[in-house]
């Protein structure tokens, strides 16, 4: 009987730990990888006004949860190469953090998952995240409209698409059409 209990406990421990989440990269390391030609990465903290929150909600059709936003500007001299923003949101019951890179025209340049605390089988694959590249804030940037959903990771894919819509709208309100 003790052996069965011990084996059951060990099996449960292995299963729980195999489904545990992961932190894939340190945030600044991820930003530096995305801007390899940058001579500096400037952090620009923005506190959104109520008017900006309202405008972002209208543009993205997604509720803004945080008013403090930090953008990471990859710069080479005085030239801005692109903009990075981290987004942490709840997928089902646990958080996911990804880094969204936005080009100067307001399009998605890249998306990288930094940390994922749900079971890893719910993690959107990088191949699917790569479908975001070149997307801009419009009605096609929606799950099942311009983006395929992921079987077995529908909530994860929905959370990512909504967060990208929200952050592209934040970018547009803060930096305008051409990142100025």
Predicted regions and their residues:
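Bacterial N-terminal signal peptides
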Residues: 7-16
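Flexible, solvent-exposed loop/hinge segments and secondary-structure transition points
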Residues: 19-147, 154-158, 162-180
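Positively charged n-region of N-terminal signal peptides that target proteins for export
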Residues: 1-4
């Amino acid at each position: 009987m003790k052996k069965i209990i011990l084996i059951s406990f060990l099996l449960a421990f292995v299963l729980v730990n195999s489904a545990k989440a992961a932190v894939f990269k340190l945030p600044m390391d991820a930003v530096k990888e995305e801007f390899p030609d940058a001579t500096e990465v400037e952090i620009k903290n923005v506190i959104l006004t109520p008017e900006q929150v309202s405008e972002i909600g209208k543009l993205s059709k997604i509720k803004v949860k945080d008013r403090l936003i930090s953008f990471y500007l990859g710069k080479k001299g005085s030239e801005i190469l692109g903009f990075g923003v981290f987004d942490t949101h709840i997928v089902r019951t646990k958080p996911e953090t990804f880094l969204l890179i936005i080009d100067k025209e307001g399009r998605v340049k890249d998306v990288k998952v930094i940390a994922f605390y749900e079971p890893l089988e719910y993690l959107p694959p990088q191949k699917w995240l790569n479908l975001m590249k070149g997307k801009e804030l419009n009605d096609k940037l929606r799950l099942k409209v311009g983006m395929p959903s992921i079987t077995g990771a529908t909530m994860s894919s929905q959370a990512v698409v909504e967060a990208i819509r929200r952050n592209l709208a934040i970018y547009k309100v803060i930096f305008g059409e051409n990142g100025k």
